[in-house]
Amino acid sequence: MKIVCALDSFKGSLTSLQAANAIKEGIGEKHEVIIKPLADGGEGTVDALCECMHAKKRTISVTGPFLEEVNATYGMTENNTAIIEMCSAAGITLVQKEQLDPYRATTFGVGEIIQDAFNHGCRKFLIGIGGS
C-alpha cells in the first residue's frame, strides 16, 4: 500500500518533514510512505518549496526582531528565484511572550535576507509572510 504524508508544520514543535518522518517511522517498512511537505507561508515554507522546486538552501546570520543575531535559511532555484520565510528573521517563534510588541520589533533581517539573495544572483522573490 502507498501512503502519502502531506503535512504542514506543528508550530513551535515539529517541521512538516519531522512530523511526516515520525509518521513514516510509526508505519514501518510494510508500506511505501511518500513524504510531501506542505506549508502555509510560515515556518516550513522554504523546506516544502525547496523540495518540490529542487532549490538549494543557504543559511546566513541576520538581525532578529529585537536586534539579536539569528540564523535564517532561504532557498535559491536554478532560475535565480529566492524562496524566503519572513518568520525566519522576524517570526513570532523568535519572540518571548513578554516581548510581544510590534512597535519595538523590527523586520530588518528580512531585508538582509533579500539583499543576500540579490547579491547571489536572485532577481525574483517568493516571500512567505506567515508566522511573522
Where are these regions (language model features)?
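IQ-motif-like calmodulin-binding regions
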Residues: 132
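N-terminal loops that bind phosphate or other acidic moieties
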Residues: 1-129
